[in-house]
């Protein structure tokens, strides 16, 4: 990480070529370097080769995009809300020919968001259900930050938020970020999983600023960031395609989360939970 930071710093003064021994990945930047920063795999760095690079770069400082929000009202009067979120942006292109599909990150989570919306439209909840597809996650959780700072709802009315990001596998189970903060709800997930025998495991993980749940957590909203674990390691690269995803536990994860919301409804009648 220190070397990566050094490369960025040096590129403010002159072009930089950095030889790396890690996988090529791509990301979205919100600032434009003054000079090129070029990465070369160490496997070809020592070969006698010459190449020319023509780089054209433009920073669109005020690019406009949007969050997409949908709402299903509760089947009876209820002031509390369950929120499902997923970011629908990815990395786009690098030049004319290099395209980053973002199958797992995060077309898979966006698909599950739509699956949840379809389910709760057909099976209304005692809660209000809010669905948010965020833009700008890859650029630094921009869409979710904007929503929290300009929210059309009272955040204190959110009973729980479930953020769906990287949902395309599951052979090794799922991880629940923030589960160390919300032990009762994490135990409920495991209780449901043990009862229904859905997933290999539900891994506990502490808070992290790595997806759109983060800004909600900072405002005191109870939230989990759920992501799948499995053999597919294609992340922020050109190989993150639909064809590489197994979706082997997609239905089971849907079952788990739907049941989680339904069990929270039952908890509402218990004094200790309110």
Stretches with model-predicted labels:
Residues 1, 56-58, 96-106, 133, ...:
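Second-shell loop/turn segments in exported
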Residues 1, 19-22, 41, 72, ...:
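Active-site-proximal beta-strand/loop segments in catalytic clefts of secreted hydrolases
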Residues 12-15, 78-82, 125-129, 156-160, ...:
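Loop/turn elements at helix/coil->beta-strand transitions in domains of secreted/extracellular proteins
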Residues 20-102, 118, 122, 126:
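Soluble metallo-hydrolase cores and metallopeptidase-like ectodomains found primarily
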Residues 103-116:
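Active-site alpha-helical elements of protease catalytic centers
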Residues 114-121, 146, 191, 259-263:
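Short glycine/serine- and small hydrophobic-enriched flexible loop segments
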Residues 118, 233-274:
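His/Asp/Glu-rich mid-to-C-terminal helical/loop segments that flank catalytic regions of hydrolases
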Residues 134-234:
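Metal-dependent peptidase/peptidase-like ectodomains
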């Amino acid at each position: 990480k220190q070397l990566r930071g050094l490369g960025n710093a040096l590129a403010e003064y002159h072009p930089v070529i950095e030889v790396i021994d890690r996988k090529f990945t791509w990301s979205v930047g919100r600032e434009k370097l003054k000079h090129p920063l070029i990465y070369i795999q160490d496997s070809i760095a020592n070969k006698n080769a010459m190449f020319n690079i023509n780089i054209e770069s433009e920073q669109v400082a005020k690019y406009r995009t949007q969050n997409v929000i949908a709402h299903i009202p509760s089947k009876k009067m209820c002031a509390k809300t369950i929120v499902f979120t997923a970011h629908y942006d990815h990395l786009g292109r690098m030049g004319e020919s290099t395209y980053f599909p973002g199958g797992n990150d995060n077309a898979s989570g966006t698909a599950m968001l739509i699956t949840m919306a379809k389910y709760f439209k057909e099976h209304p909840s005692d809660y209000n259900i809010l669905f948010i597809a965020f833009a700008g996650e890859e650029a630094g959780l921009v869409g979710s930050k904007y929503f929290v700072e300009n929210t059309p709802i009272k955040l204190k009315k959110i009973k729980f938020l479930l953020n769906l990001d990287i949902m395309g596998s599951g052979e090794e189970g799922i991880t629940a970020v923030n589960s160390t903060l919300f032990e009762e709800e994490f135990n409920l997930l495991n209780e449901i999983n043990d009862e229904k025998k859905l997933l290999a495991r539900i891994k506990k993980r502490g808070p992290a600023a790595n997806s759109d749940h983060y800004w909600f957590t900072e405002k005191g909203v109870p939230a989990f960031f759920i992501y799948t674990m499995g053999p597919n390691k294609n992340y922020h690269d050109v190989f993150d395609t639909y064809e590489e995803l197994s979706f082997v536990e997609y239905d089971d994860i849907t079952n788990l989360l739907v049941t989680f919301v339904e069990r929270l409804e039952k908890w509402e009648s218990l004094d200790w939970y309110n």
